[in-house]
């Protein structure tokens, strides 16, 4: 998911440099959403992994 966030950030930067303001804003918005969604999912999985590891051990 972070990979897609980086891809959309690059698309946004290129579109902004070429003068496509609306498309650049949309791409950066998608990149921000994907980045934070990836971080939240990673934290949730980390917490679940730690709690399940305690039950297994």
UniProtKB/Swiss-Prot annotation:
Topological category with respect to the lipid bilayer: Multi-pass membrane protein
Keywords, ordered alphabetically: Cell membrane, Membrane, Transmembrane, Transmembrane helix
Transmembrane regions: 4-24, 33-53
InterPro entries in the cross-refs: DUF1328
Subcellular location: Cell membrane
Cellular component aspect of the GO annotation: plasma membrane
A Pfam entry, by short name: DUF1328
Domain of life: Bacteria
Family: Belongs to the UPF0391 family.
Protein name as catalogued: UPF0391 membrane protein XOO1885
Source organism (scientific name): Xanthomonas oryzae pv. oryzae (strain KACC10331 / KXO85)
């Amino acid at each position: 998911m972070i990979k897609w966030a980086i891809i959309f950030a690059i698309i946004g930067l290129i579109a902004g440099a070429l003068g496509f303001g609306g498309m650049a804003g949309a791409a950066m918005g998608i990149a921000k959403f994907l980045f934070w969604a990836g971080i939240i999912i990673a934290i949730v999985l980390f917490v679940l992994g730690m709690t399940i590891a305690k039950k297994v051990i």
